[in-house]
């Protein structure tokens, strides 16, 4: 038991360190090759922050731990909005840009609804005799299609947008080429090995305590893979730049569904078992709550009181999951 917990923690460390080194090496190399900081931020850095969720969901799907794969994504999205959004707003009220309200938040809500529609064949398929909910390879390709549209749209908007004051314009670090390659290769190895340890130990811990893999995925695994987003958002709030937090949260949620579940289910279909329709509805309700606070009540500002409501919502959802054990 103690060994499983240590391996679980080691897996988290390897995943986060691997993502950091991979992002550092790849982004520095890309900037040396002439890519702008904005393009690097929209692609490599965004991928780096979503790498923990990607590797964990992918490894879970390959190993047959479908509930961890799906629970990780649904749980991460809920954690991002309620826990990270709530904590960040408590540190400093969050100002939301007009573009985020008009474009990114609606896209996030669309991704939630698309995933719910594709996942619940017994409700939406309309096929007699359908008794199992599966995110199939074809549906995975559909999610990847949405991701390509999202990426193309984002680049098109970015070209016409003014220069992002938060983009990384720091001087390119003078790392030797061999060290950059070591960062990239070492980061990938750490991600894969850490992901394997993380998933295997999480599954073992669930069996030891008699907990379902969906519970582990929705809670511990989701929180663990969301640590980069939590660190980034809280750090931004402490630096008096809390507006970065919502873009970080919303972008991560879109990546989680369109890219991560798209790749995972394309490689191996994911059966929807322990993750219930209620979990999907909590995710959708969280997104609607964020939108309501931003548009209807907050005049593009999520205040501390609203942050407290988000955080309490996460606590209530976690208590509900514990009561279902």
Residue locations for each model-derived region?
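Hydrophobic alpha-helical segments, chiefly the membrane-spanning helices
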Residues: 1-325
